[in-house]
Amino acid sequence: EARLTNPENKKLLEEGHALVCLNPEIGHILMGTEDVPYCLARVMREGRLAHTHWNSQPLGNYDQDLNVGVISPEITEAALFVLKMYGYTGYFGIDINPERQPVDVALKICMDALRAAADRINSLDYEKVVWAMMHPDKARGWLEAYLIRMRALHPEKLPPLWELPMD
């Protein structure tokens, strides 16, 4: 982009726009055996995320375009966590090929899956999550135990989570 000479392109760059951006599809990231949150973080770090393209995909190189969150919902949550940490406010596109269900039903399911995952992510105690990530020697296992409780339908049935030594 630094070598562009067209005045319109230069103006867009001066306004803070990127002319080359990515639209990563979750399923294609997985087909490439890449880590979804890490891929999104790399794109965000460079300021090149146009918008996201969501679906579910089993591991393997066969593009199935399943409904969001049907397979490995923790990947959806982790990806949303990364986007939230980067302050992403862009669009969430849905790329599915519903089998044996009407398209409008599949779209509603996908939107519900994204909303439910975002609700779980938004309800996290970010101060504790970041502290645990920054102090792994003092928080061994805490983050995993915390996330299990955040996903549990009845977390009160699990043993209480120990306190972090955040002093």
Question: Residue spans of the language-model regions?
Answer:
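Histidine-acidic metal/acid-base catalytic patches
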Residues: 1-167
